[in-house]
C-alpha cells in the first residue's frame, strides 16, 4: 500500500503561511492554490517541473480560502475571509480581477461554478448560500440567498451535469438546493454526521455524494428518484438522499477534504493527522450497500494538517494536496492489482 502513492514533486506554494485549497483548470494543465498570505498562485509544468506561472496578489485583504475555475477555463473565482469573492479573467499567462462580488456579512468560505458556467455559488460564515447568475456581458447578479443552515457554511459544490447545488456546514448537515419557479429552494437535508461537515464531492455520475467531517468519518449518500425500485420513500417529486455507506475507523483526526476522481472513481481524503488516504469501491459490491477498501495511506504526506486533495481532471492518478505547512505536493496514485 505504501507504493500506491508516489511523490512526484513538492513546492513551497505559500511560504510562512497556510495553503488552504487547490483547483485544477478543466484541461488539467494549470493548478490554482490559495493561502493565508492573501495570494493565489497558478502552477504549471515546464519539462518535468512544476513552476509558478503567475501570482494574483491584488484582489483580497485577508486569507483566500477557496478558488474555483469556470467550466470554460477562462475565469477563476476566489473566496476570501474579507467577505468578498473576486472573479479573475485569464489573458494568456496573466489574470485580471474583473469583478468583486460583495454582499456576505462575514468570511466567504467557498465558491463553485455550475457546469453550465452561467451560475456561481458562494457560502459564508454568515450561514447563507448565495446563487449568482452570470450574463453574456460578465455581469453577476445575486438571484437567491439561501438561509437553510443554522451555522457557518463551509463548502459548496455543484452536481457534475445538473443545476443541483450542495452545501456543507458547521451545523453537521449537508443541504441540497434546486431552482423552483424563479427562486432556489432547499430540497433535501442530509443528517447523520455528528460534527462539522467540512467538504463534499459528487461521484462522476452525480448519483452519489461523499461528505467528510470533524467526526472522522466519510459518508456516502445516494440519490433515489420517486418510484425507485428499492422502495426508498420520496417527498412528492423531489429525489430522496440516503446514507448507504460510512467509512469509519480509518482517520484519527478531522477529515478536511474529500475528492472523488471523475476518471477512475477513486476517493481521496485530506486529514488533520497529516495523512492522505485513497479508497476504492470493492469490485462487485452492492450498489445499494457499497463497500470501500483503503488502497493508499501516506502517513506523513505533509508536516502539518492536510487541507485539500484534488484529482487532475485529465490525467488518471495525478493527485495534488496542500497543507498548513504551506506546501503543495503532487502525487502519482497507482491502483493496486486486482481492483
Curated annotation (Swiss-Prot):
What the record says about family reads:
Belongs to the WD repeat CIA1 family.
Residues in coiled coil: none
Keywords for this protein = Chromosome partition, Cytoplasm, Repeat, WD repeat
Oligomer and partners = Component of the CIA complex. Interacts with CIAO2A and forms a complex with CIAO2B and MMS19; the interactions with CIAO2A and CIAO2B are mutually exclusive. Interacts with CHD1L, ERCC2, IREB2 and POLD1. Component of the MMXD complex, which includes CIAO1, ERCC2, CIAO2B, MMS19 and SLC25A5. Interacts with WT1. Interacts with CIAO3. Interacts (via LYR motif) with HSC20.
Instruction: Report the SUPFAM superfamilies cross-referenced here.
Output: WD40 repeat-like
Q: What does this protein do?
A: Key component of the cytosolic iron-sulfur protein assembly (CIA) complex, a multiprotein complex that mediates the incorporation of iron-sulfur cluster into extramitochondrial Fe/S proteins. As a CIA complex component, interacts specifically with CIAO2A or CIAO2B and MMS19 to assist different branches of iron-sulfur protein assembly, depending of its interactors. The complex CIAO1:CIAO2B:MMS19 binds to and facilitates the assembly of most cytosolic-nuclear Fe/S proteins. CIAO1:CIAO2A specifically matures ACO1 and stabilizes IREB2.
Query: By its UniProt entry, which Pfam families does this protein fall under?
Result: WD40
**Which organism's genome codes for this protein?**
Mus musculus
Cellular compartments annotated? Cytoplasm
Q: Which gene encodes it?
A: Ciao1
Q: What is this protein called?
A: Probable cytosolic iron-sulfur protein assembly protein CIAO1
Q: Which InterPro entries match?
A: CIAO1/Cia1, WD40/YVTN_repeat-like_dom_sf, WD40_repeat_CS, WD40_repeat_dom_sf, WD40_rpt
Any single GO BP term: regulation of transcription by RNA polymerase II
WD repeat spans: 14-53, 59-98, 103-142, 148-187, 192-231, 250-289, 301-339
- Which residue numbers does the motif LYR motif cover? 176-178
Query: Which Gene Ontology terms of cellular component type are present?
Result: cytoplasm; cytosolic [4Fe-4S] assembly targeting complex; MMXD complex
Tell me, what is one Gene Ontology molecular-function annotation carried by this entry? DNA-binding transcription factor activity
Amino acid at each position: 500500500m505504501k507504493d500506491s502513492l508516489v511523490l512526484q514533486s513538492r513546492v513551497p506554494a505559500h511560504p510562512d503561511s497556510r495553503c488552504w485549497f487547490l483547483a485544477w483548470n478543466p484541461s488539467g494543465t494549470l493548478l490554482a492554490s490559495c493561502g493565508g498570505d492573501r495570494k493565489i498562485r497558478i502552477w504549471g509544468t515546464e519539462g518535468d517541473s512544476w513552476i509558478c506561472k503567475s501570482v494574483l496578489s491584488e484582489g483580497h485583504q485577508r486569507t483566500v480560502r477557496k478558488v474555483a475555475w469556470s467550466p470554460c477555463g477562462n475565469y477563476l473565482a476566489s473566496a476570501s475571509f474579507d467577505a468578498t469573492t473576486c472573479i479573475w479573467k485569464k489573458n494568456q499567462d496573466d489574470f485580471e480581477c474583473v469583478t468583486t462580488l460583495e454582499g456576505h456579512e462575514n468570511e466567504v468560505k467557498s465558491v463553485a461554478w455550475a457546469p453550465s458556467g452561467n451560475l456561481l455559488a458562494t457560502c459564508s460564515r454568515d450561514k447563507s448560500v448565495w446563487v449568482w447568475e452570470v450574463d453574456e456581458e460578465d455581469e453577476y447578479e445575486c438571484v437567491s440567498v439561501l438561509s437553510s443552515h443554522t451555522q457557518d457554511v463551509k463548502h459548496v459544490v455543484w452536481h457534475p451535469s445538473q443545476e443541483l447545488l450542495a452545501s456543507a456546514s458547521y451545523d453537521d448537515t449537508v443541504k441540497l438546493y434546486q431552482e423552483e419557479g424563479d427562486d432556489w429552494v432547499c430540497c433535501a437535508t442530509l443528517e447523520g454526521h455528528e460534527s462539522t461537515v467540512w467538504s463534499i464531492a459528487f461521484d462522476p455520475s452525480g448519483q452519489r455524494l461523499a461528505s467528510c467531517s470533524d467526526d472522522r468519518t466519510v459518508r456516502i449518500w445516494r440519490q433515489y428518484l420517486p418510484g425507485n425500485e428499492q422502495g426508498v420513500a420520496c417527498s412528492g417529486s423531489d429525489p430522496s438522499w440516503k446514507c448507504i455507506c460510512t467509512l469509519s475507523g480509518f482517520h484519527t483526526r478531522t477529515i478536511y477534504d474529500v475528492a472523488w476522481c471523475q476518471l477512475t472513481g477513486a476517493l481521496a481524503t485530506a486529514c488533520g493527522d497529516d495523512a492522505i488516504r485513497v479508497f476504492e469501491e470493492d469490485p462487485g459490491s452492492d450498489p445499494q450497500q457499497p463497500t470501500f477498501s483503503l488502497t493508499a495511506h501516506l502517513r506523513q504526506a505533509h508536516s502539518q494538517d492536510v487541507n485539500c486533495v484534488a484529482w487532475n481532471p485529465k490525467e488518471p492518478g495525478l493527485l495534488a494536496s496542500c497543507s498548513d505547512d504551506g506546501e503543495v505536493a503532487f502525487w502519482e496514485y497507482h491502483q493496486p492489482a486486482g481492483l
